[in-house]
UniProtKB/Swiss-Prot annotation:
Annotated compartments: Nucleus; Cytoplasm
Disulphides: none
Gene expressing this chain: IRM1
Species in which this protein is naturally found: Arabidopsis thaliana
Protein name (database record): Protein INCREASED RESISTANCE TO MYZUS PERSICAE 1
Zn finger region (FLZ-type): 56-100
InterPro entries: Zf-FLZ_dom (IPR007650)
Amino acid sequence: MVLGKRHGSLIKRTTSMKMITLDTPTIYDASQPSDHLTFHQHPHNPMVVMASNYDDFLKTCSLCNRSLCHHRDIYMYRGNNAFCSLECREKQIKLDEKKAKTGFVTSKKPIRI
């Protein structure tokens, strides 16, 4: 018996790739002026707008509301929760665990009719 080789049914290839259409990029002549702006020249770059929308949670600590400095470490928890210190982060984790635990215990109580 040879390790790593399996004998069994072969997988049949399908023709699904024929159904996919690709958009080919349009090539513009550089000698003619164009009103199309490149990604870097666009004044309203959606990536920049998106980044500025998400930067709001990086201004203050999610627990004590202390302002977060740019030159200091920021401790993250659950994606959009920023904390000024490891202690604040751990306090929030313990609070969330306590909420989850008490919510779980109360849901086990039987409902009386």
